[in-house]
């Protein structure tokens, strides 16, 4: 049986999932900075970007499937990142 996470670990994991969501959305939407440059993975190939998105989608899917969440988490952005990420990867 898996060890139950502490409240601090759950909060840290939820924040880490948010970081993955931000990364996925930045890649998928080709988010740019004020200078018009891509904010993440500027010099990466499409294959490298897809690999990064795929890894992060897998991570947030795994984390969301854990059963010891508190029940007050908002999964809206996570679900959108999963859907958008899978569509991007193809």
Please provide the spans of the model-predicted regions.
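Beta-rich interaction/scaffold domains
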Residues: 1-90
